[in-house]
C-alpha cells in the first residue's frame, strides 16, 4: 500500500494537494469554540485546509508532502477494504486497519474543514482519490463537529475575504494568540489571552492592543506588545477567510 500511495502522490494532479495547509490547532484561533453538534456532510477536498502535524510530518507543508511520509503499516493485509473505505460514506465507520479504532473526524469553521482525527488516512485518501479517475474527490458523509466563526473576528475576516485587508496570526499556545490586520498603511494588533479553565464564548474574543500607521510604528508596537517579530506571524490566505464565512457544509449536513 505504501508504494500505491507514493505512486498516487507522484501522479495525482490537483491544486489542493500542493497548497500549504494550516495546523488544526492554529485554525481553532478563528473558532467560537461553541459546538453546533456532530454532522455528516459531504466535504469537498477543496474545503479541507488543515491537518495536525505529527513528529514524522514535522517538515511537511502540503498534503502531497505528507502522503510521501506515510508508513501505511498493516494496510497491505486489508488493501481491498482500505481502498473501498476511501470512496465510501464514512460516518462512524472505523478505518479497517488494526489499531485504528475511531472514525475519521473533522472539525469545521463555516465551510473550512480541518482534520481532528485521522491525520494518516486522510492524506492517503486525498492523493489516491485525486489519482483514481473513478474515485470522488470528496469526504462522503464524514463525521464533523461544526463551529461558528469567532465573533470578534467576523468583521476582520469579512475585510480580508473581500481583498480589503491582510490578516496575520501568531499562536503562542492555547491561551495566548495574536492577530495583525493590515489595511493599506494602517495596522491593528489584537490579542486573546485567557486563563486556564475559561471556556465561555467571550473568553476567546480578541481585543485591540494598539494600532497605527506605517511600518516604523508597527515595529515599535511589536517590540512592546508581541512576543515575536512580524516575520514569525503567518498570513491567512484570502481563500480560507472566505471559507470561514460560508455555511454550505451545515446546510448540506445530516445530524
Predicted regions and their residues:
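Short alpha-helix boundary/capping and kink motifs at helix termini
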Residues: 1-112
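Sequence-level detector for tyrosine residue identity
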Residues: 16, 21, 40, 68, ...
Amino acid at each position: 500500500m505504501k508504494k500505491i500511495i507514493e505512486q498516487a502522490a507522484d501522479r495525482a494532479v490537483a491544486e489542493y494537494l500542493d497548497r500549504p495547509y494550516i495546523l488544526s490547532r492554529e485554525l481553532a484561533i478563528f473558532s467560537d469554540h461553541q459546538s453546533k453538534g456532530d454532522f455528516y456532510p459531504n466535504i469537498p477536498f477543496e474545503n479541507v485546509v488543515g491537518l495536525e502535524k505529527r513528529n514524522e510530518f514535522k517538515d511537511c507543508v502540503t498534503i502531497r508532502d505528507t502522503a510521501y511520509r506515510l508508513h501505511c503499516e498493516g494496510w497491505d493485509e486489508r488493501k481491498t477494504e482500505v481502498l473501498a473505505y476511501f470512496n465510501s460514506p464514512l460516518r462512524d465507520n472505523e478505518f479497517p486497519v488494526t489499531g485504528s479504532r475511531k472514525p475519521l473526524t473533522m472539525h469545521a469553521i463555516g465551510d473550512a474543514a480541518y482534520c481532528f482525527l485521522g491525520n494518516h488516512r486522510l492524506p492517503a485518501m486525498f492523493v489516491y482519490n485525486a489519482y483514481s479517475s473513478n474515485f470522488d474527490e470528496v469526504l462522503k458523509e464524514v463525521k464533523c463537529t461544526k463551529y461558528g466563526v469567532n465573533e470578534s473576528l467576523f468583521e476582520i475576516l469579512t475585510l480580508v475575504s473581500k481583498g480589503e485587508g491582510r490578516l496575520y496570526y501568531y499562536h503562542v499556545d492555547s491561551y495566548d494568540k495574536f492577530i495583525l490586520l493590515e489595511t493599506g498603511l494602517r495596522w491593528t494588533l489584537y490579542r486573546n489571552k485567557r486563563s486556564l479553565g475559561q471556556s465561555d464564548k467571550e473568553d476567546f474574543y480578541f481585543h485591540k492592543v494598539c494600532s497605527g500607521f506605517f511600518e516604523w510604528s508597527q515595529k515599535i508596537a511589536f517590540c512592546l506588545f508581541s512576543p515575536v517579530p512580524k516575520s514569525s506571524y503567518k498570513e491567512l490566505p484570502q481563500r480560507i477567510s472566505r471559507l470561514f464565512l460560508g455555511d454550505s457544509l451545515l446546510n448540506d449536513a445530516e445530524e
